[in-house]
């Protein structure tokens, strides 16, 4: 059974807020590889603390960062 996926919209948010990966690393207290993996969508298990730090740094809601994509019927 197909359940759908979660799309990470970090690149679009960063562009909208005019924020570089380096600045996000600094503001969210994350290392480069973490930010890069979130930007590339290479995350299989989300860390609530990391998501909270990203949302705080970007001044956004969790729903702005993540989107549920239902399975194709």
Locate predicted features:
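Short alpha-helical DNA-recognition segment
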Residues: 19-37
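Short, basic-rich loop-to-helix N-cap that marks the start of a DNA-contacting helix
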Residues: 42-53
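Residues within the helices of the helix-turn-helix
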Residues: 11, 22, 52
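Residue-level detection of the helix-turn-helix DNA-binding "recognition helix"
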Residues: 15, 29, 40, 70
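Short, charged recognition helix plus adjacent turn
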Residues: 37, 66-73
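A short, Lys/Arg-rich alpha-helix, primarily the initiator
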Residues: 1-19
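The alpha-helix within a helix-turn-helix
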Residues: 14, 25, 55
């Amino acid at each position: 059974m197909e359940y759908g996926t979660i799309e990470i919209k970090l690149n679009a948010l960063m562009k909208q807020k005019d924020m570089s990966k380096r600045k996000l690393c600094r503001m969210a207290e994350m290392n480069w590889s973490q930010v890069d993996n979130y930007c590339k969508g290479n995350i299989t298990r989300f860390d609530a603390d990391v998501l909270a730090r990203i949302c705080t740094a970007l001044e956004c809601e969790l729903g702005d960062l993540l989107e549920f994509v239902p399975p194709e019927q």
